[in-house]
Amino acid sequence: FLILIGASLFWYGKKREGITYMAVLIFSQIVNFQTKAFFSLPRPTSHEALIMANETTAGYPSNHAQNGIYMFSFLAWIERRISLSVLLGICIGISRVYLGVHYPSDVLGGWMFGVAFLLSTTTLIEALEEKRLIRFHDTVGKRVAFTFLFAFIIFFFGAEPEFRYKVAPLALSAFLVLSFLEMDWRVPTRTRLVVALVMGGAGVIVLRAGLKMLFPATIPFDTLRYIILGAWIALVPLLFLKLGVAEKKT
């Protein structure tokens, strides 16, 4: 779901925002996993709270709180609308305490990490816009080098094997395709945006489920499945342009 939010921004034509969001989101998951492993703080026990969900990882910081405040606040920053989105992010953190799976300190820690990654993302985007950093469209070689470096970090510092063999291939595939896709586009109307999101999302669902039934349940084929998904996310704007759903920026 969190990756689809970034894909949706990308499909909308907010290329820089979507790519930066996904890269920072994936990096934030690595930091969350490593922080949990470092502190190894326990979650509430049945003697302290009514536990309504099953969790097996350490408690601090709350990943749900971190992701919630990061995702909704970033969307609010893009649209320059703060109140509702930030409120939703806060509610996710509060719900984790209500479900008995986190202490308030876990949630506060998650919020702090989420805000830190939000500020990192917005600062990076603004720096890219002002060309204070290497532009995303600078050279193909730089983009390819960054892609492989990013995939290396995900694979060796990521969390469980599922993260390494699914998220890393998806990100590598999507970013690698984008390294050679030198164009900008926009979806001019809300109606066309809905069509673009339905087309892109339906493709992800069909490919993910269809290839799962077609391929054997092994790590190499799971990796291949997510490589194909990453390529679809990056290439589907070409279909939008072909069908007139999107138009090239001049």
Map each language-model feature to its residues.
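Short helix-capping/hinge motifs at transmembrane helix termini and TM-loop junctions
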Residues: 12-13, 39-40, 100
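Interfacial segments of alpha-helical transmembrane regions
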Residues: 8-28
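Generic signal for short, ordered secondary-structure residues
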Residues: 13-14, 87, 215
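C-terminal regulatory/interaction regions
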Residues: 185-250
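First transmembrane helix
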Residues: 1-9
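Membrane-embedded catalytic cores of phosphoryl/pyrophosphoryl-handling enzymes
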Residues: 4-5, 19, 29, 33, ...
